[in-house]
Amino acid sequence: MALEIGFKRIKREVGIKRCVIIDGNVGDVYLDDKNQIVDLKKYLTEMLEDLKYDDIVYWDRVNGIEGDISSLKITEEKEVEGEEYSLDDEGENQNTTISNGNFKEPSEVFNLVFQNLTNKNRKTVFILNWSDYLFSNGGQHDNEERQNLTLLGKSIKDKKVNYLSTDVNESTIILITNKLSNFPLSFYQANPEVSTITLSKPDRLERRRLLEKIEAGFELKFNPGETLLNSSRTNEYIDVLEDFTNREIIQMAKLSRKEEKLTFDKLYLLFKYGEKDNPWEKLAYEDVKNIKKKLSERVVGQDEAIEKIEKTVVKAY
């Protein structure tokens, strides 16, 4: 259960680590503990509610902040001292004032994190989702981005270590990104306060579990008395969905209701390649048998290449 292992690790390390970075298959949907299909935001929120956090604040660049921030400290940003990450040319630090109630600017939300992460009277978790669009690619960061990272790094380091706390889950930051490379190595590598967790695509057991959930959503042709999960080929159907996300499996079910009834094989080909017929099935045996001769008639002086093509085609056929 690859996804389940990832989520269990997140639940275990949130509150122990001061920063948890989640990357990989973060744009998918998942089956939660109640067997409901939810996105990552909903899954994390349910998990954090179970951990009894006082404040759960979610942020992305499009919608800004979601969640009750009435108990949080909100003031103007002040310059902070700290290590700047991925330095290129030095630039002047600039103060930023929180001017938008939705906190859509990264500098605004990072300032909010800095002011509240060290509050020992409340347990607060910040979920910051920028996927691909907050920091520059390739580890190159401009002055504002370096300042944001400085604020974040200082928030993590400034929280006092309390090893005798009665509540083991302390305030923390969860960062969501498609690619871990969006962060400079110096931010998370060899940093004991930062954990990186990669969400994989669903494994075989998880694909079967999803199919059990949405089986009624497939409209397919089967032999009499057979269904998607009660067929002599059920294991093949699950295996062929290797490397699919849960979203793609759900989309495939929707496609089955949009088209005329197809077999699972034809639906798979239509969804993945845009054609419901396998071109290899249309290839006549005689054509495969004589492919070397036919290619030699059209191409001169490429005997070695023709032999390689022949072997590849025969093997695939």
Model-identified regions with their sequence ranges:
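Hydrophobic transmembrane alpha-helix bundles
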Residues: D167, L210-K213, L262-D277, V300-A305
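Generic detector of short, locally flexible boundary/turn motifs and exposed helical patches
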Residues: G138-Q140, K160-S165, L270-G274, K292-R298
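Conserved helix-loop functional segments at active or binding sites
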Residues: A216, L220, E297, K311-K315
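Short, contiguous clusters of charged residues that form electrostatic/catalytic patches at enzyme active sites
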Residues: T150, K154, E307, K311-V314
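Dynamic helix-loop-helix/coil hinge segments at AAA+ ATPase domain boundaries and subdomain interfaces
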Residues: M1-I5, K276-K308
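ATP/nucleotide-binding catalytic cores
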Residues: M1-F264
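Alpha-helical lid/collar subdomain of P-loop NTPases
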Residues: T245-Y285, K289, K293
